[in-house]
Amino acid sequence: CLPDPAALSRRCTHPGGERRGGSGRGGAASGRRRVRFVSAVPGPEEPGSPRGGRRRRAEASCAKPRRARTAFTYEQLVALENKFRATRYLSVCERLNLALSLSLTETQVKIWFQNRRTKWKKQHPGADGAAAPAPPAAARCSPSPPRPAALPGQTFPSYAATSALFPAASPFPPGRPRRRTLRSLLGARVPRASTPRTSENPPRLCPSAPGVRNRVFLLRLASTKRKNTYML
């Protein structure tokens, strides 16, 4: 516990520590005593103090490490600028090929093009809409299929060449009557699909055919024989 300030003021009269009316060794011994008051609130730390250095180290360790900037060579910058003049948006395949040719990573090429586009838009504020959007990734990487005419050993004649391959036949060949051609055309018709007939209308046999008569007679004879056998 801290001593009472009123009691201390009685003992210590001035910074020298001498007592009023005190003399001898007792007064000198009591005057040598000095009281130090330690404040509970810490004061401002000096830049060279050890506590300030520790706090700076802790803040530096907690801060996010800064990524090092990529140092491009002159040849790489020239190649990137030429590619940017050709197109401001790279596809995935073009970006990968450019990174391999320049010994860079795909991320470095992507970030360089993003920064270059931002710089170009600042230099040309009215030409933002002129930049063509990047095509989708599926359409960019997939190569276009070859045309049918480019395949070896295959030819696809156009519609205009069909007349040369299949010449139009004359409607009526010369020297032949018109009736024969009509009969030949009618005889070459494709037969229609026969519809199944119901049991109510059985097919009628032509009585004029001799073979059909014999079959009908045999069927009737067989049916009468069966009836006779059943009756017996």
UniProtKB/Swiss-Prot annotation:
Q: Where the record puts its DNA-binding region(s)?
A: 65-124
Membrane in keyword set: no
Highest taxon of source:
Eukaryota
Tissue expression remark: Transiently expressed in the birth zone of the whole spinal cord regardless of the axial level.
Spell out the GO cellular component terms annotated for this protein, sorted alphabetically and separated by semicolons: nucleus
Q: What is its main location?
A: nucleus
**PROSITE patterns to which the protein is assigned, alphabetical:** HOMEOBOX_1, HOMEOBOX_2
Record's protein name = Homeobox protein SAX-1
Q: Which gene encodes it?
A: SAX1
